[in-house]
Amino acid sequence: MTTQITYFATAARGFEEMLKTELEQICQAECKVTQGGVHFTTTQRGAYQALLHSRLASRILLPLVTTKIFSDLDLYATIVGINWAYIFDPRDTFFVDFNGTNREIRNTQFGAMRVKDGVVDYFERKGFTRPTVDKDHADIRIHVYLDRENMVVSLDLSGDALHMRGYREDTGKAPLRETLAAAIVLRSGWQKGTPLVDPMCGSGTLLIEAAQMQAGIAPQLHRKHWGFNAWKGHQQAVWKEVLEQAYLQQNEEIQPLFFGFDLDHRVLAKAKQNAKNAGVAHLIQWQQGDIAALKNPCPEQVGTVICNPPYGERLGTTPALIALYSVFGQRLKQQFSGWNASIFSGEPELLNCLRLRSHRQFKAKNGPLDCLQKNYQISERTAAEQQADELKFEQNAQVAPDFANRLAKNIKKIEKWAKQQGINAYRLYDADLPEYNLAVDRYDDHIVVQEYAAPKNIDEQKARQRLLDAVSATLYVTGVETNKLVLKVRQKQKGTNQYEKLANKGDYFYVTEYGAKLWVNLTDYLDTGLFLDHRLTRKMVGQMAKGKTFLNLFAYTGSATIHAALNGAKSTTTVDMSNTYLNWAEQNLELNNLPLRNNRLFQADCLQWLAECRERFELIFVDPPTFSNSKRMEDSWDVQRDHIKLMTQLKRILTTDGTIVFSNNKRGFKMDFEGLAELGLQAENISHKTLPLDFERNPQIHNCWIIRHIEN
């Protein structure tokens, strides 16, 4: 049993050096680090000890053959040439894990199939029973790693991956692998025998791993099935000694200094059961609670706060997360003065919302996500310093103060005006400060923050941080609830991407505008269903529509139709290509108790419908897209290029004393006055009259024209 063999322990990228240190401590192995794991030389007893005690290894492999292959024939020949009868009985089941490709073997499934064929053919040629493949519960797992022409064939002594400790019956929505959780604990700076607090513990994995470390409980102590159980080289007597020694190493006389908090009582119930399964239920105290009310359970001692809070790729929405991290940072400073903290997150910018300065940080992968773990030393503060810090927090002085001040100033001016106007949907901020390139809109008691696409020369991470700071400041200045703040990234519209669905929440509510009720949806689409900058245009159209036949072309959700109908239009006709938005327009009509018999809706290509129209209208409102190349349109559309073609068709259906209200959002749009004159039409630019107070900083957001027949 003193024979030295070189094994290979796999690990998540970034944990190789930690695994090397761990293996040296567990079995005094000679170790060599490589990407993705550690080669370690030890006895078979040492390998058993590593399997039982390693918290960081994903698998432990016994290399059987290391060779070079150049084709699938080489692969097959190598596998057939291994003495498999010396390794396992053909009556046992097996499975092949194949990793890597080269020019000839381009698919891991193909590689695994050729290995399987080689193993089966070996036994059949030797006159043995044909072994069976079992994907889920194999007795033997064969591991093959291929890197270009270099191949290693190994026996997987682990069986199931070593992160599967067996204590987790159920988890929350976004669990950590146990190996990653152990690495986070080891990197946190936590010292055994000191308190460890997880304020957002979820299913409890961080605390359970730490408690097992403190109690000396081997992570695989209760595992029943191993990859070596059916291996003919397995030494049961040695394994039994290693197992018995592990039981003797447990330390039952330790203080219960582990504390887990979570808002969700159902997740806490799972955490309690997991802790019981892991043998550490008596060491961990669990409590349901909100992070905003977090209190230090051991104020007389110094310990560590460890946490894997939610982040954008996992749970929650950005505004709620910004508020969560901001409050968390404040509670750390208020309640854990003199303690250490270690926070793991998939969004480094969110860690900045803690407003703490880290002294160490580590990169790691959580599945496909690039994550960061930051360690902090929370400075001790006097009562006066804590009070001053709380005042700063209340004033939000540390987060985007210039933006916060401008937003507060705008709110004071605009909300008074909006109340006088009888509207509850309006813009509060529109890129007033160049470093905060975003818009803030109020829709009743909701806030929408729209980030404009940053120029290419702006650092993406810096822009992201400014956005998070601005959202944090908006939450404070407006006082809006986090679940009523919606964040959007708004880019230049191309074609019909304003119609593309972003979500499927179906959260509709209505806003009021000069007596009209209009449905909005802040989450499911790029736009909300209401263009706020056209508010005065809609009001004007409504006033002009009294007693007239009205056509709304490129109608979107029909908001202009609602104003026209409420102001006494003789009839309204609403046309849009999108069935979604036409249904929305119908809902707007129903909301305002406007009957469909006087207010017709047509779902059609607007230009094609116009060409076929034989009716005439006294008032036409047309607000076409700047550009469109929808598959449902016969031709592409460009408002600058094609507006005279549009006017040609509109003139045909316009009564002699009729009016066209023409609007578009193309910056730098130039009206073709000569082309209009040739049609017998004249245009008046009324853009300045249709620009409301909340958009006065952006006079080019739209242009608007009154077009009539030239008087003879």
UniProtKB/Swiss-Prot annotation:
<comment type="similarity">
    <text>Belongs to the methyltransferase superfamily. RlmKL family.</text>
</comment>
<keyword id="KW-0698">rRNA processing</keyword>
<dbReference type="InterPro" id="IPR053943">
    <property type="entry name" value="RlmKL-like_Mtase_CS"/>
</dbReference>
<keyword id="KW-0808">Transferase</keyword>
<dbReference type="InterPro" id="IPR004114">
    <property type="entry name" value="THUMP_dom"/>
</dbReference>
<dbReference type="Pfam" id="PF22020">
    <property type="entry name" value="RlmL_1st"/>
</dbReference>
<protein>
    <recommendedName>
        <fullName>Ribosomal RNA large subunit methyltransferase K/L</fullName>
        <ecNumber>2.1.1.173</ecNumber>
        <ecNumber>2.1.1.264</ecNumber>
    </recommendedName>
</protein>
<dbReference type="GO" id="GO:0052915">
    <property type="term" value="F:23S rRNA (guanine(2445)-N(2))-methyltransferase activity"/>
</dbReference>
<dbReference type="Pfam" id="PF02926">
    <property type="entry name" value="THUMP"/>
</dbReference>
<dbReference type="InterPro" id="IPR029063">
    <property type="entry name" value="SAM-dependent_MTases_sf"/>
</dbReference>
<keyword id="KW-0963">Cytoplasm</keyword>
<dbReference type="GO" id="GO:0005737">
    <property type="term" value="C:cytoplasm"/>
</dbReference>
<dbReference type="Pfam" id="PF01170">
    <property type="entry name" value="UPF0020"/>
</dbReference>
<dbReference type="InterPro" id="IPR000241">
    <property type="entry name" value="RlmKL-like_Mtase"/>
</dbReference>
<dbReference type="GO" id="GO:0070043">
    <property type="term" value="F:rRNA (guanine-N7-)-methyltransferase activity"/>
</dbReference>
<keyword id="KW-0949">S-adenosyl-L-methionine</keyword>
<dbReference type="InterPro" id="IPR019614">
    <property type="entry name" value="SAM-dep_methyl-trfase"/>
</dbReference>
<dbReference type="GO" id="GO:0003723">
    <property type="term" value="F:RNA binding"/>
</dbReference>
<keyword id="KW-0489">Methyltransferase</keyword>
<dbReference type="Pfam" id="PF10672">
    <property type="entry name" value="Methyltrans_SAM"/>
</dbReference>
<keyword id="KW-0694">RNA-binding</keyword>
<dbReference type="InterPro" id="IPR002052">
    <property type="entry name" value="DNA_methylase_N6_adenine_CS"/>
</dbReference>
<feature type="domain" description="THUMP">
    <location>
        <begin position="46"/>
        <end position="157"/>
    </location>
</feature>
<dbReference type="InterPro" id="IPR054170">
    <property type="entry name" value="RlmL_1st"/>
</dbReference>
<comment type="function">
    <text>Specifically methylates the guanine in position 2445 (m2G2445) and the guanine in position 2069 (m7G2069) of 23S rRNA.</text>
</comment>
<dbReference type="InterPro" id="IPR017244">
    <property type="entry name" value="23SrRNA_methyltr_KL"/>
</dbReference>
